[in-house]
């Protein structure tokens, strides 16, 4: 039997994990951009291609060339991180539960991590 308090506490803990993981990734991204100008330039271009993709998609234009360029930039960024000895996924968000990305839900389904936390009454862990 689930207690409402335990469920709320489990959701709060999972939310804190998500917020913390995202904040840590933001810090790593900022550090990388300030230490490695080539990565900062790629990030700047990625922001531009992302906006351009959105505009083209809304206008019904051909997004394939920009989509390819975006993928090239992401691959180049990951290669640079490897080259710098950081690991390609260094700036990625490191979620406690990669299945739900620390939301407690996969789509509209309650994730295993939230179920387990509530079921065993370990929301305080």
Predicted regions and their residues:
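Short, charge/polar-rich alpha-helical segments
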Residues: 1-11, 17-44
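Non-transmembrane amphipathic alpha-helical segments
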Residues: 35-56, 73-76, 80
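Short, charged, amphipathic alpha-helical segments
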Residues: 62-72
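Amphipathic alpha-helical coiled-coil segments
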Residues: 70-90
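Short, flexible, mixed-charge glycine/proline-rich loop motifs
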Residues: 84-94, 102-105
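The −1 position to Zn-ligating cysteines in a subset of zinc-ribbon hairpins
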Residues: 96-99, 110
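Cys/His-coordinated zinc-binding microdomains
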Residues: 101-104, 112-117
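Conserved small/polar residues in nucleotide/adenosyl-binding loops
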Residues: 123-125
